[in-house]
Design a protein with these regions (language model features):
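P-loop NTPase motor domains
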Residues: 2-18, 22-227, 240-243, 291-294, ...
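C-terminal regions of RecA-like/P-loop NTPase motor modules
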Residues: 184, 239-364
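H-loop/switch region of ABC-family ATPase nucleotide-binding domains
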Residues: 233
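Aromatic-lined carbohydrate-recognition surfaces of secreted/lumenal glycan-active proteins
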Residues: 236
Length: 364
């Protein structure tokens, strides 16, 4: 069985006009410009986000914890938007600080020791053209594509060995979510963290920030907006027993459980404090049958404390292939897709190949 992230990749192939799959490896542009504000002056929340992002770029815990430095950076970012009418991005902001230099001290009434320009320019140069992390801020056509997609997949597996980069990318992604999901309350958006157990432990050694605390905050915030957030884990034992895990559980309104073993069921009952015995029995009753005449899968769904049900999913052969994660079948579908250029066509061709194989076996 392949990773479930491959399923999201295959779905994005099936709906290329409505979806986007970004497998970020650090060697190509990310395609997100957090400094972009569509010609509007950024509000206080946006300014705070940009300040936090620049502080991450700066990578100095001492500066992050120095109120004077943070206030100075806030003033400079605000003045940047006042002075520069368009073309906002981090490289442009960097050049603005470089160009204005020590004149900023006088213009903004900042003491030199309250903002170390030389340190900023030296450390943050890694995010400029030619720098080690230049692709984080490099312009890309993907930026426009993201504005017009309903389903976006960010694959960060290839950079998981760089906790600092992951922390930076997550900050940028959350800003994108803020703009795409939360800014328009007429549209309900959903954020899903797949294979979350692997990523929750990642911690930025410079700022001390970790993914788990950030996601816990996201749960709390999205619950108050017209949005939803979900995390996918194999077992709750994979999550640390701390305030952030408890916060995520407390803010979980819908619980989904796939068929598992008794240990996983018992962990779920304990973590979510499920007292209703009928809910527990219902959860433990679910089964999958992929070898029958009509293959199906079952899932237990619990709506907070009030209601629980089991849903059985039977799919047509075409839809079953669209959600396929089996290694052999997935690889064959991808092979046909590369030739056909369409996942829909690949599924039909795969069915035809299977039918021919079956007819050949029957005629022997």
């Amino acid at each position: 069985t392949r990773r479930s992230s491959d399923l999201f990749y295959q779905l994005s192939q099936l709906y290329p006009d409505r979806s986007l799959h970004i497998d970020y490896d650090g060697s190509s542009p990310l395609g997100i410009n957090p400094f972009y504000t569509a010609g509007k002056q950024p509000d206080n929340e946006k300014i705070k986000t940009l300040v936090n992002l620049v502080l991450k770029f700066w990578r100095s815990k001492a500066i992050m914890e120095d109120t004077k430095q943070v206030v100075s950076l806030t003033k400079i970012i605000c003045r940047y938007y006042e002075d520069i009418p368009d073309g906002h991005c981090f490289p442009d902001f960097y050049r603005y600080v470089q160009r204005e230099g020590k004149k900023l001290y006088e213009r903004l009434n900042i003491l030199p020791e309250y903002f170390d320009i030389d340190s900023f320019l030296h450390v943050c140069s890694e995010f400029m053209p030619g720098g080690f992390y230049e692709n984080v801020c490099k312009p890309s056509p993907l930026e426009n594509d993201m504005q017009n997609r309903d389903f976006i997949v960010f694959e960060l597996t290839k950079i998981k060995k760089d906790p600092f980069l992951i922390s930076v990318i997550m900050t940028i992604l959350f800003d994108t979510i803020e703009n795409k999901i939360l800014s328009d309350r007429s549209v309900r958006g959903m954020l899903i963290f797949d294979e979350y157990a692997e990523s929750q432990s990642i911690k930025d050694t410079f700022s001390g920030a970790d993914i788990h605390s950030t996601v816990a905050f996201c749960y709390q915030k999205l619950r108050k907006e017209n949005g939803a957030v979900g995390t996918i884990v194999q077992s709750l034992a994979q999550l640390p027993d701390n305030e952030y895990t408890k916060g995520i559980i407390a803010n979980t309104q819908l619980l989904y459980v796939l068929p598992a073993n008794e240990i996983v069921y018992d962990q779920t009952v304990e973590a979510f404090h499920i007292k209703n015995r009928s809910h527990v029995n219902l959860m433990k009753s679910i089964r999958n049958d992929f070898s029958g005449v009509r293959p199906y899968s079952e899932i237990f769904i619990r709506f907070m404390d009030s209601y629980a049900t089991v849903v059985r999913l039977e799919l047509s052969p075409e839809k079953l292939l669209a959600f396929q994660t089996d290694g052999e079948k997935w690889n064959k579908l991808q092979e046909i897709y590369k030739e056909a250029g369409s996942m829909e066509t690949a599924i039909e061709k795969y069915k035809q190949l299977k039918q021919k194989s079956y007819e050949t076996e029957m005629s022997m």
